[in-house]
Structures are given as structure tokens and as C-alpha cells.
Amino acid sequence: MSEILAPCGAMESLTAAVSAGADAVYLGEEYFSARKNADNFTAEQLCDAVRFCHYSGVKVYVTLNTLVFDREIPLLAKAIENCAKADVDAFIVQDMGVARLSRQIVPELPLHASTQMTVNSPEGAIMAKELGFTRVVLGRELSFAQIKAITESCDIETELF
């Protein structure tokens, strides 16, 4: 299944992506997005964004793709709870601790392995699947042959970044 996935840094770009026919959007949560200097969504803005997208039949994936330190765990837990309350469709993560905490708080929410997890082989895709990820985001440095080998290795969604 193909999916047109668009990055969104603010409501303006989100509205444009939905209007242009995106099937899904991904956006940054205000504290745990790797794009710290970009516009990211507060908890309140996230609720509005998800409501608008779901009304339009568009999925919303939230990036929680920073490396997290112990002192940040309470804030991360609150961010995960806020995203769950907003009814996001998946998290995109790179830190296994974030994946674990997400599973503890909202076990039913799909996890996507960020390109920062560097799943670059069939073995990596198989491991991601075994760890409960539903999708792996493959890096742009992979060849078509490598991508084919990964996609044929196991039943996990693949996304090309």
C-alpha cells in the first residue's frame, strides 16, 4: 500500500498538505522533536491538528525522535499522554527508551522506527518487527537492491525518507 506522507511544522503547512491530498502527515511534538529549531506543535495545537486531519481522513504521526535523558522522563510521559489524548495514529521514535515508555503508557499505539534508528538491513527490519515496531523508515543512502531486500525480508511496513 502506498501512502503520501507530508512533513508539517505548523498549521499552515498541515492545511496545505491535507488540501494537496496527503494520506498522512508527520509533525513534531514541542519538546521531543529532533527539529528543535523548527515550528513544532504544542499539546493544544496537536489536538486541533489531529481533529482537522481525522475529519479529512488523514492520519497523524508524531515524531518523538530525540535521545531522551533520565531527567526528561516525566516530561516525556506527559507528552506521550497528551498525544494519546489527542488520538494520534503513531509515534516515530529513535530511542528504545521512548519506545518502551510509549508501550507502557499506550500499548495499542503503533510505533515507527525512525530513520535515525538506522535500519539498513533485513536483519534490522526483522529485529524492529520483533520489538513491536509496525514500520521502519529507511534512509536515503540505501540502494534499490537494499530496499528490496529489506521489504522482502519480513512483514513490516517500510517508508522511504
PLM ranges: what are they?
Residues 1-161:
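Non-catalytic helical/linker scaffolds that mediate oligomerization, partner binding
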